[in-house]
Each structure stands twice: as C-alpha cells, then as structure tokens.
C-alpha cells in the first residue's frame, strides 16, 4: 500500500510479477485493502494486478477497518475488464449480500460466516 500511495507503480507491479513467477501455476490472489484506498488507487491497482499476471484481485483481508462493499466490487469488476477475477471478502453477512456481490460480477466470495449465512442466520460483526 505504501508503494502504491507513493506512486511507485512499477515497483508494485514487479513485486506481484515476482510472486507470480515464484508460485508458477498456483492461483495468486492479490489483496488490496480497498478500505485504505481512493477510487483512483483501486482502479490503478486493478490495472497493476492484472498486468502483473495475478489470477485474482481481492477486496480485503478481513483484518482492516472494513471489508467488501458493493461500490468497490462494481468498480473492480469494471476495472479488471475480464483480465483477472475479482474476489469480494470481508463483511459479507447475508445471502442477499452474497447474491448482490455475484450479480455485480464478483467471481468468488470470502466469508468466515458461510455456515451461518447458508442456515439463514444473520451473521453479525465484521
């Protein structure tokens, strides 16, 4: 995040490329912590992550100030232009949330509350 905010885009891209080269055919998901970025930075990261060869760009770790939101997922889906996949993670607490993220174009969802959600319980907290 620091290098992105400092405008060191080539360094960020090369770091991701190096990781992708190291993992080879394994799936690489790059977490960008959308809650810490501006919309312009999120768009820039979509370009960088896809150009670097990552398989997924992911909204959050679940350990920062916020998780996935509809605005960010829609922005990311548009930003990747099908070049890589989008994973919405963090803060997903209802079936309706899951359905909306998928309708917006998320390819994968991440939640620690899947059992509660699928059992129809409101999963509380972040």
Where are these regions (language model features)?
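Alpha/beta enzyme core
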Residues: 1-86, 94-120, 124-126
């Amino acid at each position: 995040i620091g290098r992105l905010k400092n405008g060191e885009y080539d360094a960020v891209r090369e770091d991701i490329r190096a990781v992708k080269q190291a993992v080879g055919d394994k799936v690489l998901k790059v977490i960008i912590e959308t809650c810490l970025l501006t919309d312009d930075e999120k768009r820039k990261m979509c370009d960088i992550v896809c150009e670097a060869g990552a398989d997924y760009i992911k909204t959050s770790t679940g350990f920062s100030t916020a998780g996935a939101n509809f605005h960010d997922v829609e922005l990311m889906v548009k930003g990747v232009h099908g070049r890589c996949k989008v994973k919405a993670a963090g803060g997903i607490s209802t079936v309706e949330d899951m359905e909306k993220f998928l309708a917006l174009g998320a390819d994968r969802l991440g939640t620690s509350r899947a059992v509660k959600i699928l059992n129809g319980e409101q999963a509380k907290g972040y």
